[in-house]
Amino acid sequence: TTLTSKKLNGVVWNADINDGELNAKTDYTSILYQASVFNGSANVYAPRYRQAHIYSFFSSDTAKAHAAMEQAYQDVKEAFISYLQLHNHNRPIIIASHSQGTLHAGRLLKEFFEKKS
């Protein structure tokens, strides 16, 4: 989760995917130091999504926090469906995640792969 600005606590619940400053923060932290480990062995597909503000994990406004996480997950899910349809070509998949993305990845795995055999 790179949407962490304290001035946005309880005001902005989800990131704007066109926020250049936030995207650069994500690219030069999470993507550079974590996702790049796969560069030599796999095609990395790391789409932008409207990540929930870190405040969503701690807020007493559980309805808004849940809605923010749900919006983020729906973006991840849509990106995954798009990846499968346009880019995967029936190749094996590695789903790696960190922080908030791990919650979304776990849900994605359950929804798409659990009890599918």
Region annotations inferred by a language model:
Residues 2-92:
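Active-site catalytic motif of lipid deacylating hydrolases and related acyltransferases
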Residues 92-94, 110:
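Structured, solvent-exposed acidic/aromatic patches
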Residues 97-101, 105:
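Gly/Ala-rich beta-loop-alpha elbow adjacent to hydrolase catalytic centers
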Residues 104-113:
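Short glycine-enriched nucleophile-adjacent loop
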